[in-house]
Amino acid sequence: MSTQLVKIGTWGGNGGGRVDLSVLPRSLKSVTIRSGAAIDAIAFTYIGTDGKEHLAGPWGGGGGNPTTITLGSQEFVKGISGTFTNVVTNLKIVTNVTTYNFGQGGGTAFSLPLQSGSVVGFFGRAGALVDSIGVYVHI
């Protein structure tokens, strides 16, 4: 079965600088989020289309508390949701096992539940905080 990689999003503001991947993702291994009142930063490890492990980020600032999600061998991200103002204020990462919740929220809601496929990477805009976020999805 062949898969297709698509970019979906972004949700958030226009501040900060553009952040994206130089090697396209094939699978997501772990995600580290720094958060407090908002999403301060995101970093993640992934296996690229070149077959190698890559680290993206951290994108954003050094505030907030860091939390790392290490995906299990059979765990995958089946959706994201959250809220934003001019920055991302809340991010929920939904896997086939559990839901991880970051930031305090407020603003406009967004949601991307996937009926099939999985989130394999992120892109967006970042400066002192994560200004906007989008996802790479294998469908």
Swiss-Prot record:
- In this chain the Jacalin-type lectin domain maps to 5-139
Q: Which PROSITE patterns match?
A: JACALIN_LECTIN
Which superkingdom heads the taxonomic lineage of this protein's source? Eukaryota
Instruction: Say yes or no: keyword Cell membrane present.
Output: no
| Summary of the tissues where the protein is detected | Expressed mainly in roots.
Q: Which GO terms describe its molecular function?
A: carbohydrate binding
**SMART domains noted in UniProt:** Jacalin
Q: Which UniProt keywords apply?
A: Lectin
Q: Which cysteines are joined by disulfide bonds?
A: none
State what protein this is by name.
Answer: Protein GOS9
According to its UniProt entry, this protein's organism is Oryza sativa subsp. indica (Rice)
